[in-house]
Structure formats: structure tokens, C-alpha cells
């Protein structure tokens, strides 16, 4: 049939059926999809929430399967070499802006994840069953004769035009982990559906997304909806992800309904996982050609009272956990602020292109805390930063909770303070006058120097002669030797000060700084955790 006649026919049938032309094409694509081969069953979010609630009232069943030897013993290189056949992509027949492909089970991915395609008009779902014909094994050593039965999948990835079937922009793989890219196309930090007992007396629990349901989008849509069922020994959950793949960012609106099977010591909402090895202020693990190595450089918080917080990340010598109490936070996230290649000199992992991740609550979260876990790491392949929201009210068996929030995967958060922001933090030897770096004579008294740069917020428009006052507090020791320097290159200011110990304590020093003029606050609040050396190490020679 001629393309124009096909369009006319589609519009005529659409008028008869009540579907739009694009909706009809989407329905046709769903009906004829070669990936979804299961029987049609009714599906909606209300039924999924009921299913999750009912599941929480039953004993947990570990669904990890014994994989065939060819999959159980495979290397990461072999696993990554398994390719999905683009001819069997979920929305191949739609020939639209989005498409979905699935990850194979194998290696440590043993939990079979069930996938379903949903017709948004009829609300009927069909399962996509695993079969080897969906994948390409030519570049692997996989013995396909061992691949018998419905092994399920381990996750999925999303593609966006014009690079359908080439470069994915979003992926869900392993437990409840997922991540997305911004305009650079570079993956970075990850998010999770739920965190349980990350920093608790018992072992951390990693819930699994065990099933997904994908609503078929309209042909020209860059937005789609996916539902997920979460399961673990301590909790179940029903999730709705409204995912908008914009030109410069991916935005997810998440509606999470969580049911507690057991009492949960620490529940982590909107958890995110990142890596910080070294940066401008932390050089302990930076003996490489790279000036900085990190997926994120700070935890940013917009508190419920309106205060903006910048907390630079650390790679501590021993595990550190910090809780920042709040009520109805306006947002928080792990941010990669520096996107200059020169700051990383990296042509493999491209840290200069890594996105930030910002959480924006869309429901009232009440009292709780933004928690930050920093774990020692010796290399960039090990994630060592975790951040999430923990409700103040204890979670007991039988409790049901609902959290709504948006996730923004973008170069920088979608919102920022109107005040000056921290541009960079630096730390080094103290106790001497700038311009007279120790050579023949080191300082007689040991100290640690900090340089905090502020920019934006109208600092470049302050009247000449405006007095800039740094307000600094510390949990122990003392701070002095203040300097306020003009930085023309960033149209801002550098605050210099030294910290001096007043005891032998090696407890972390909690530093807090903002700048003001007279009674007007000029900047967000800088929080920093410094780890002083042992008394015998407080010397320069």
C-alpha cells in the first residue's frame, strides 16, 4: 500500500476505534511484536500495588537460579560480548524514538527478571520469554545447547533515536540498580530502587527488581512508563517510573510504594552510589597521572528550611557515616561540578563527562536525614560513596510507605541557590604566609590550610570596598590566619584559613563556612570533614 494511503487508512480506522493515528500505530506495533510472546493478561498500577502488598505478607523466596555452567563461569568480557538482536527489540515494529533491549543472565546475575509489554489502551500485558534466538552469541564462548528453559533476563537498556540499537541512554541491571546519561552519553553514578541496612548492625540487604512492565509509547514519544515489582527478605515494593528522555537530560518521575516484611533498622529512599578516589582537596590516593579521579565531587543539599549545603566528598582512611537531619527536604544529590578535561586528563573513563544526579521530592517526606556513607577505596573501579534519605520514624513489619520524587540525570542539578556557590575546595600544608612556601625553613607549628573558592550569586557585582566576612566554626581545634582573596578568573573570592589542633585527638574535624557582608549572607554553606593525623605525624620534617 502507498504510504499516504496507509496513513489515510490508519486515520480512518483510528476514527472508528477511538484511537489516535499514532496510538493505533503503537497498538499495532505492540500486537505484532516479536519479542512479547506471552498470553495477554490484565495489568494496571493498582493491581501491582496490591500484588506487592500481598507479597509482603508471605515468606520471602530466594529466586536466584542455578545457571548452566556456560553462564555461571563466564568472564565479564564474555558476558559483555553477548549481543541482543536488534531485530527483536521490544518496540522494533514501532520504528519510533525509543526502543528496549534486554540483558542476558549470567555471571553473578542469577535472579531471573520477568519482562512484560503493556498495551496502554487495553491495559493488557504480554510477557517476553527468554529464548536464545533473541541474542547473538557469535563473539562469545557460550554453549547455546545448555540454554534450555525460560532463564529470564537480568535487566534492560533503553535506546533513543537517532542512535537506536547503538548507544543506550538508560539501563537497569542487577538488584535494583539503574543509571542514565545526559547529553554527553557517558554513564557515571548509579541509583537504586531501595537501600536496606546500608550502615546498620546487620549485613546490608540488596532488594531486587524481579519484574518490569513496559507501556508501549507513541511513535514520536521520547517519554514512556515502566512499572517494577521489588522484592527482598525485608520489603516489597511497587514502582512506577515515568521516564522523559530529553535532549540534555533524563528525568524520572518515581512513585514508590514500599511494604515492610520485617522491622527495618535503616531504610534508604532514593539511594545513589558513586565513586570518589581523589580530588582537589583529597590527594591521598592520587599518585597517578590524573589530577582528579571521581564520578562525583560533592553532596549538595537544599534543606527544608531553604539553606543550601555543599559537602565535598572524601576518600577516608576508614569508613565514615554522616546523617544530616532535615524535615521535608527540597532536594539533594551527588554532583559532578567540574567538567573540564584538564581537571582529569582521562581518555578512558571520561570523568569530565560524567552526569550529576539530583533528587527532588514530590511528596511530603517528613522528618528524617540525608545520609552519606564514605568508604575507603584504593581504586576507581570500586564505588565508595552512598547517599540516601532515611525516615526518622522506625519502620516496623506490616508498615506501608509511599514516596514520590524525581531524578534528574544531567550535567548539573536543575536548581541552584541564588547565593554564591562553592567552586572548589583545596587543602594542604599550613602555618606559613602565602607566597613563602616552605623551602629551607618549615613552619615551627603544624597546621592544615584550607582554600574554599566561591563564585556566582552576584559576587562580581558587589560595590567596591564591600567587606567580605568568612564565618567559620569547627568541632575541635581552632581556626585562624584568615585571608579573603579576589579571584578574577571565576569572578569570585577565595577564603583561606588554617586549622590548628589543640589536643591529641584524631577524631574527624567538622568544619563549617559561609561568607557574609554585614548582616547579609552571601553564599551557600560549606561543610567539610577533615581527618587529622596522629600527634606523632604532626610535623613537616
From Swiss-Prot:
One of its GO terms (cellular component) is outer membrane-bounded periplasmic space. Pathway: Glycan metabolism; osmoregulated periplasmic glucan (OPG) biosynthesis. Disulfide bonds: none annotated. It is found in: Periplasm. InterPro entries: Gal_mutarotase_sf_dom, GH-type_carb-bd, Glucan_biosyn_MdoD, Glucan_biosyn_MdoG/MdoD, Glucan_biosyn_MdoG_C, Ig-like_fold, Ig_E-set, TAT_signal. Keywords: Periplasm, Signal. Predicted to be exported by the Tat system. The position of the signal peptide cleavage has not been experimentally proven. GO terms for biological process: beta-glucan biosynthetic process. Pfam families: MdoG. GO terms for molecular function: carbohydrate binding; catalytic activity. Its main location: periplasm. The keyword Secreted does not apply. Residues 1-29 form the signal peptide. SUPFAM superfamilies: E set domains (SSF81296), Galactose mutarotase-like (SSF74650). Probably involved in the control of the structural glucose backbone of osmoregulated periplasmic glucans (OPGs). Belongs to the OpgD/OpgG family. This is Glucans biosynthesis protein D. It comes from Pseudomonas fluorescens (strain SBW25). The lineage of its organism: Bacteria, Pseudomonadati, Pseudomonadota, Gammaproteobacteria, Pseudomonadales. The gene is opgD.
Amino acid at each position: 500500500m502507498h504510504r499516504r494511503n496507509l496513513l489515510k487508512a490508519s486515520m480512518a480506522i483510528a476514527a472508528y476505534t477511538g484511537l489516535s493515528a499514532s496510538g493505533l500505530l503503537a497498538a499495532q506495533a505492540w500486537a505484532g511484536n516479536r519479542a512479547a510472546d506471552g498470553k495477554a493478561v490484565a495489568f494496571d498500577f493498582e493491581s501491582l500495588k496490591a500484588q506487592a502488598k500481598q507479597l509482603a505478607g508471605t515468606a520471602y523466596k530466594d529466586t536466584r537460579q542455578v545457571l548452566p555452567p556456560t553462564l555461571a563461569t563466564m568472564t565479564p568480557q564474555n558476558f559483555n560480548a553477548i549481543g541482543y538482536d536488534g531485530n527483536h527489540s521490544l518496540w522494533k515494529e514501532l520504528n519510533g524514538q525509543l526502543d528496549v533491549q534486554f540483558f542476558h543472565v549470567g555471571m553473578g546475575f542469577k535472579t531471573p527478571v520477568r519482562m512484560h509489554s503493556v498495551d496502554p489502551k487495553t491495559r493488557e500485558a504480554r510477557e517476553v520469554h527468554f529464548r536464545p534466538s533473541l541474542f547473538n552469541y557469535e563473539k562469545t564462548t557460550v554453549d547455546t545447547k545448555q540454554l534450555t528453559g525460560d532463564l529470564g533476563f537480568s535487566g534492560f537498556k533503553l535506546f533513543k533515536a537517532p542512535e537506536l540499537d547503538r548507544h543506550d541512554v538508560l539501563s537497569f541491571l542487577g538488584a535494583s540498580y539503574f543509571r542514565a546519561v545526559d547529553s554527553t552519553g557517558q554513564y557515571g553514578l548509579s541509583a537504586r530502587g531501595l537501600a536496606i541496612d546500608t550502615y546498620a548492625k546487620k549485613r546490608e540487604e540488596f532488594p531486587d527488581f524481579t519484574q518490569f512492565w513496559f507501556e508501549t509509547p507513541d511513535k514520536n514519544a521520547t517519554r514512556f512508563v515502566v512499572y517494577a515489582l521489588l522484592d527482598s527478605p525485608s520489603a516489597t515494593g511497587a514502582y512506577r517510573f515515568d521516564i522523559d528522555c530529553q535532549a540534555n537530560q533524563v528525568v524520572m518521575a518515581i512513585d514508590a510504594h514500599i511494604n515492610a516484611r520485617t522491622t527495618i533498622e535503616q531504610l534508604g529512599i532514593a539511594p545513589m552510589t558513586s565513586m570518589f578516589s581523589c580530588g582537589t582537596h583529597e590527594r591521598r590516593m592520587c599518585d597517578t597521572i590524573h589530577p582528579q579521579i571521581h564520578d562525583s565531587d560533592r553532596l549538595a543539599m537544599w534543606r527544608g528550611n531553604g539553606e543550601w549545603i555543599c559537602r565535598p566528598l572524601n576518600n577516608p582512611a576508614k569508613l565514615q557515616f554522616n546523617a544530616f537531619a532535615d524535615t521535608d527536604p527540597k532536594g539533594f544529590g551527588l554532583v559532578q561540578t567540574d567538567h573540564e578535561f584538564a581537571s582529569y586528563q582521562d581518555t578512558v573513563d571520561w570523568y569530565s563527562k560524567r552526569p550529576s544526579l539530583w533528587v527532588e521530592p514530590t511528596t511530603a517526606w517528613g522528618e528524617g536525614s540525608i545520609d552519606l556513607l564514605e568508604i575507603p577505596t584504593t581504586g576507581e573501579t570500586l564505588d565508595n560513596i552512598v547517599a540516601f534519605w532515611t525516615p526518622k520514624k522506625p519502620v516496623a513489619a506490616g508498615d506501608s510507605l509511599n514516596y514520590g520524587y524525581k531524578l534528574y540525570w544531567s550535567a548539573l542539578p536543575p536548581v541552584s541557590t541564588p547565593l554564591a556557590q562553592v567552586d572548589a575546595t583545596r587543602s594542604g600544608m599550613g602555618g606559613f604566609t602565602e607566597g613563602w612556601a616552605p623551602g629551607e625553613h618549615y613552619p615551627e607549628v603544624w597546621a592544615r590550610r584550607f582554600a574554599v573558592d566561591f563564585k556566582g550569586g552576584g559576587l562580581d557585582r558587589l560595590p567596591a570596598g564591600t567587606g567580605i566576612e568568612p564565618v567559620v566554626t569547627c568541632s575541635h581545634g581552632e581556626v585562624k590566619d584568615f585571608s579573603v582573596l579576589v579571584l578574577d578568573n571565576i569572578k569570585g573570592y577565595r577564603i583561606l584559613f588554617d586549622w590548628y589542633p589543640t589536643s591529641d585527638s584524631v577524631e574527624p574535624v567538622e568544619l563549617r563556612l559561609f561568607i557574609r557582608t554585614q548582616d547579609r549572607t552571601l553564599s551557600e554553606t560549606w561543610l567539610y570533614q577533615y581527618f587529622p593525623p596522629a600527634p606523632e605525624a604532626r610535623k613537616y620534617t
